[in-house]
């Protein structure tokens, strides 16, 4: 109710029986445990345009489950009741990206009209409320609260030193004085408090510090750092963000954490202090536990006090992307979808300089050691006397490398990384495009397994290509024309995502509707069915498949 009031949203419009997830389990089946309540509770007349270009005015009905989530619970028997940092980081990134979008402006409370925030106190004038609209503002509030919950649990309960769980750490953390990390897998014993599930007990089942876990947490925590940044030196902070964290509705950071001195930072539980503390631990561990200083590359594991010798191109590439966000956040540069933009403020922090050095080292290592004669990158290598490279060259690795090298180019302004990314994309087009499925395959003519990590890399790699690798004046590669890149994105999305990766579709903003008098469960004609008709005994939630075969 307090959050609804802060954004000018009627409390009566908040969906009933919400169960916000403080921190996710590592896996589970998204099939519903019972039939969703499809009782009609409302209706409206709307104009729709389908994916096939058909436009019409229809009468839509609103089922009960759209406003009351009680019947949408998943089958808990399918859950792996364990915590994993990469899983937590993945959902945290989604939360913070949307939070910044929803809370990046304010709105006139009476009319719901979006306006730019001209001060951090604008929401206190009796005319304006937080959020770009009442509905979006409420969503941003909920997501921010869920993000804070995750970080509090990680700070207070999940620090691990190889022997003990729940080890405390502070902003002065230095691995040289004893490494503390987030273990790869922690089993959860459930309890119950105030009618909801709680953490009764925790037990480490895989003590490894994983590079994937580390970068996949560093990226969103870096974003959250920038979103919640209250440092006095950051004069470029969005006033709309500052208003969210000024004590109402969310706590402000203590002065020790917002002044220009890092050495006096303290542990606290407000949003910015959590991000400040946890991002430092993750960054220090990237540098000390996972970065091979001699070779200039990240390795996948740290176990029993020893750094591993396995280099994985996917994780090394995304480590560059994560580090670039962290560097920009520390230096008060724009992040999120503005992470390629400049700013009048650049704090040029020591941490930022160190991050840039590792980004450059990793990018150079890939260019020197991991590109084959066919122009494609190898999936990885083992650091040994012979520096043994993998034989495989997956779709995942190619697009991850493109994503990472573009991040390196934007961070360092070294054009050789941009040219390398362009060359890899052209090699992908030459060696991997399968005309029969109108998208890429590891071996054209054969089935390729796609996971959400595959989809993430392809989507991100193509986005970077469209923004930063497309032909400019004097360049004429047909495959790198913007129209060609756009066509590739659309054909991939329709064939792989709509073709099977996306399991179901929610109604409303997605374009999907329940139409009065119609039995169709794909009314927007994009090939993805509504949650009530997407497989399983009672239907399936709108998630991505864990694995699909594309052929």
Locate each region found by the language model.
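Glycan-recognition and catalytic cores of secretory/periplasmic carbohydrate-active enzymes
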Residues: 1-551
């Amino acid at each position: 109710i307090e959050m609804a009031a802060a954004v000018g949203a009627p409390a009566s419009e908040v969906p009933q029986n919400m169960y916000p997830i403080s921190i996710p389990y590592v896996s589970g089946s998204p099939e519903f445990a019972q039939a969703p309540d499809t009782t009609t509770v409302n209706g409206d007349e709307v104009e729709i345009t389908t994916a096939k270009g058909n436009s019409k005015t229809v009468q839509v009905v609103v089922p009960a489950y759209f406003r009351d989530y009680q019947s949408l619970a998943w089958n808990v028997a399918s859950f792996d009741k364990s915590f994993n940092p990469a899983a937590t980081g993945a959902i945290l990134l989604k939360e913070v990206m949307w939070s910044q979008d929803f809370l990046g402006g304010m709105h006139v409370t009476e009319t719901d009209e979006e306006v730019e925030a001209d001060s951090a106190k604008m929401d206190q004038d009796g005319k304006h409320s937080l959020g770009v609209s009442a509905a979006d503002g409420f969503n941003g509030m909920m997501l921010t609260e869920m993000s804070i919950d995750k970080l509090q649990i990680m700070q207070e309960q999940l620090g691990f030193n190889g022997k003990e769980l729940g080890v405390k750490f502070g902003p002065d953390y230095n691995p040289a004085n004893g490494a503390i990390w987030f273990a790869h897998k922690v089993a959860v014993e459930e309890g119950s408090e105030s009618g909801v599930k709680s953490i009764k007990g925790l037990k480490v089942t895989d003590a490894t510090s994983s590079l994937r876990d580390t970068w996949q947490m560093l990226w969103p925590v870096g974003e959250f750092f920038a979103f919640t940044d209250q440092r006095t030196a950051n004069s470029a902070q969005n006033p709309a963000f500052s208003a969210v964290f000024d004590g109402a509705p969310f706590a402000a950071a203590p002065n020790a954490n917002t002044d220009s001195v890092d050495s006096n930072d303290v542990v606290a539980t407000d949003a910015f202090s959590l991000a400040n503390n946890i991002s430092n631990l993750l960054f220090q561990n990237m540098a000390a536990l996972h970065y091979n200083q001699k070779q200039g590359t990240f390795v996948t594991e740290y176990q029993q006090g020893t750094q591993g010798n396995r280099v994985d191109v996917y994780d090394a590439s995304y480590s560059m992307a994560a580090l670039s966000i962290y560097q920009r956040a520390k230096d008060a540069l724009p992040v999120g979808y503005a992470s390629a933009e400049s700013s009048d403020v650049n704090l040029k922090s020591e941490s930022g300089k160190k991050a840039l050095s590792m980004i450059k080292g990793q990018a150079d290592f890939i260019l020197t050691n991991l590109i084959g004669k066919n122009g494609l990158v190898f999936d990885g290598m083992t650091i040994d006397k012979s520096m043994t490279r993998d034989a495989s060259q997956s779709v995942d690795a190619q697009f991850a490398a493109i994503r990472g090298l573009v991040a390196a180019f934007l961070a360092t302004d070294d054009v050789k990384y941009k040219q390398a990314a362009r060359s890899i994309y052209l090699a992908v087009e030459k060696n991997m495009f399968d005309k029969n499925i109108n998208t890429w395959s590891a071996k054209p003519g054969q089935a390729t397994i796609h996971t959400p990590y595959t989809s993430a890399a392809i989507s991100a790699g193509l986005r970077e290509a469209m923004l930063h690798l497309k032909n400019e004046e004097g360049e004429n590669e047909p495959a790198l024309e913007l129209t060609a890149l756009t066509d590739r994105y659309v054909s991939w999305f329709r064939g792989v995502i709509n073709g099977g990766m996306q399991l179901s579709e929610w109604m409303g903003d997605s374009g999907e509707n329940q139409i009065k008098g119609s039995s169709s469960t794909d009314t927007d004609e994009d090939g993805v069915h509504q949650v009530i008709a997407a497989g399983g005994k009672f239907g399936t939630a709108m998630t991505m498949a864990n694995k699909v075969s594309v052929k």
